[in-house]
Amino acid sequence: FGDCYVVTAYVPNSKGGLTRLPQRQRWDRDLTAYLQRLDAVKPVVFNGDLNVAHQPIDLANPKSNYNKTPGYSQAEIDGLSHMLQAGFIDSWRHQHPEDVCYSWWSMRSGARERNIGWRLDYQLVSHRLMDQVASTAILTDMHGSDHCPVELVLKA
């Protein structure tokens, strides 16, 4: 893309018992630094399964999962917060500040049917690119995986 970088990644899961949390924290630091280097050249759109629910609104059961379940530890939340403080915007949350919508559901116990999910999939954009974001969506009606697609439309 000529006007911006588009980066896609699967961010490593911290695993049960948060056994891989130190590796995850290193990944988050290195990824943020990489995105900042790109952003110094031209704006960035960063898409991916970030394996973190950033705010309590981003998962169905925040209290029972906090600091116990991979994807909702304070260290993982802080990793994404640092990325946002480094000049990136969670484009979906920016456009839908109060909406409860998930992009991932466990395959167990009919979680998707009961909408017991997590918002793990994000499209972060450089701050200076946010005014070019026309719309964002989480396509919950799309099936075929434990995740659903997320959509970002930039203005022409």
Regions found by a protein language model. Give the residues of each.
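Active-site regions of metal-assisted phosphoester/phosphodiester hydrolases
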Residues: 1-156
